Amino acid sequence: QEHSSAASDVYKRQLQMRCSEVFGIDIHPGARIGKGIMIDHAHSIVIGETAVVGDNVSMLHSVTLGGTGKDDEIRHPNIGDGVLLGAGAKVLGNISVGSCSRVAAGSVVLQNVPEKTTVAGVPAKVVGAAGCTNPSISMDQIIKRK
């Protein structure tokens, strides 16, 4: 059993290195990724070691799920189910993005995001409702004011 776990760890590291080399993507082998993730224009994606990505999440190019250097154990964000992460979005630190929310392109998220909301800006602030039941599937990026 230990041998298969060690072999699995080696395989994960090799896969990480190959993806980084070919696509410019760095997904740490320790990150937990849900089913149905969609990475559109798979380039310049960074997902840190303690990040958790829920089911049916869509992320566009240049998304970072990274740390801030301030946390010891859980350093990366928890992304809920059905979230849409716009191009260039940076979600940093031990924070949560609630299910069925949207993070606008170019936003820097440093605080928790409630479910079914849209955040935008640097730093990101709530700018409206998510506007649909499943942003990651509809890929709707129009801001709907509350």
Where are these regions (language model features)?
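Intrinsic disorder/low-complexity segments
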Residues: 1, 83, 133-135
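Conserved beta-strand-loop-alpha-helix hinge in the C-terminal portion
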Residues: 115-137
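Single conserved hydrophobic/aromatic residue that forms the stacking wall/gate
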Residues: 1-7, 11
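Left-handed beta-helix
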Residues: 23, 29, 34-35, 40-49, ...
